[in-house]
From Swiss-Prot:
The lineage of its organism: Eukaryota, Metazoa, Chordata, Craniata, Vertebrata. This is Craniofacial development protein 2. The gene is CFDP2. Residues 1-16, 23-37, 45-55, 86-111, 134-172, 502-516 have a biased composition (Basic and acidic residues). InterPro entries: Endo/exonu/phosph_ase_sf (IPR036691), Endo/exonuclease/phosphatase (IPR005135), Swc5/CFDP1/2 (IPR027124). It comes from Tragulus javanicus (Lesser Malay chevrotain). Residues 1-222, 488-574 are annotated as: Disordered. Residues 199-208 have a biased composition (Polar residues).
Amino acid sequence: MEEVDSKDISSSKAEDCVPSGGECHEEAVDELMKEDEVGGEEETEQTKGIKRKAESILPRKNKQGRLSLEQEDEEDANKESGGGGSEKEDAATEQEKGVESEDARKKKEDEVLASSVNDAEPESKVPPSTPAKTGEETEETRSGEEQEKPKEMQEVKLTKSLVEEVRCDRQQGRSSGMTPEDEPPRSESSPCAPGQVKKTGTNASSKNEPAGAKWKGQPAVDASSDESKLRCCKEEYCIGTWNVRSMNPGKLDVVKQEMDRINIDILGISELKWTGMGELNSDDHYIYYCGQQSLRRNGVALIVNKRVQNAIIGCNLKNDRMISLRFQGKPFNLTVIQVFAPTPYAEEGEVYRFYEDLQHLLEITPKIDVLFIIGDWNAKVGSQEIPGITGRFGLGMQNEAGRRLIDFCHHNRLVIANTLFQQPSRRLYTWTSPDGRFRDQIDYIICRQRWRSSVQSAKTRPGADCGSDHKLLIAKFRLKLKIIPKTTRPFRGTNEADDTSEESKPSSEQKGKEKPQASVPSAVSSVPGGSGVTKEVGATSQEAKSVVKQNEKEEPQANVLSAVPSLPAGSGVF
């Protein structure tokens, strides 16, 4: 390298620094010389650094095959020239520094975005997408920095979109009541390639979840559906039917004990063989019965315990073969009909009248009510399954009465419940012949098809015994019954006899009408078939009115009350 003449370099500077007088002190000249030497040393250091960079660039360019021999000769000439190429190399270094500053700024932006992503999302175990740089790879990556710039811009855009997606997911999680802890764990996988961002949305996480898994914020059952509302408000009750073959006072006590032991809420009785119709209370058991007026034949009854008695809203004493009770329930009311069908050897007209009366009773029953028809049907439906009517767990062979019963169920959309549940044979048959050789299923619990799912089980209880050839048949169903509030009547005083005004006369006559009816069941007057009792009550009231009118003419009104209890016709009613 040629030596640079310091005099040529410093001549211009010395001329600039000469004072206006043309004289120069020796100290000033020494300082100028020192500054020139320091500047020369700095320039030599810069040129050395430029040469080193150029030497490192040359082998890299030779490897890539981008430089020819002529270019290498030119670079050698530039090294020898030194001064002219130094300015170009300075410009190159400044450009590299600018690129490095831009890279540093972009890295800072990426770090800020990554920190925001970490704040928005839980920490994941996925390793960073860019591998660590080693000392050998730095030289190769510098040449590809310009090519990686557009890729880095794509990564920045993707990270920004990822941050927006995470924010949207967080807002959706807050609106649904979820916390970051409730979010499903993210799946671990291999690091992503450069220029690609791993999607961590809900679609990717749902693939790794089990099929039946649900988040805490989502309900397991849709509470708004009608079926769920019905399911939540139901309670279990037990209903049963029993042919007792005549009910004497001793057998009634046995039946009540069995009801308490098995926890039966509603029990239907067939072949009661009581005369008349009405209701009575016996040891917290309420009995509604209906029989013939004179003959102790047939007869049906419904016995309820104290738990459901307050829910009764109606009673229909139809005839000696059927009776019904209606209970107030939630969400729908409950209607229970107890029947005693004619035997297969009965006349055809009697069987026809039975089904005609039962059809009329069904027509006046609200369609929306939960309906149960229980009793002794004297029919065999057989073990063959009929979809929608009978199940696979019947017993015996079908007979003519059984076919008639199946037609009746098909016409009214009814299902025989005790053929739907698999039970041992001793829990299926309901009647045993006197010699014990034959066992048949002739007692049934029937319900509407739409309420088939409310029945939990249906079977007989062989352990219950009241001296009958029939077994007790029970079924458990789910429904909620409501208690009806009692209505209190206004209290009537006893000073009506002292009142001599004309206004007291109608009240005394009305009182005379009410007293003979005190011991007669309230449901008798509204029951078809109870006409004999109503006629007797009407005749008694007419006689009481005539006696009261005669006493009013002869004596003061104070003697009206004394005349009413002495009626000969009223003694038979009390």
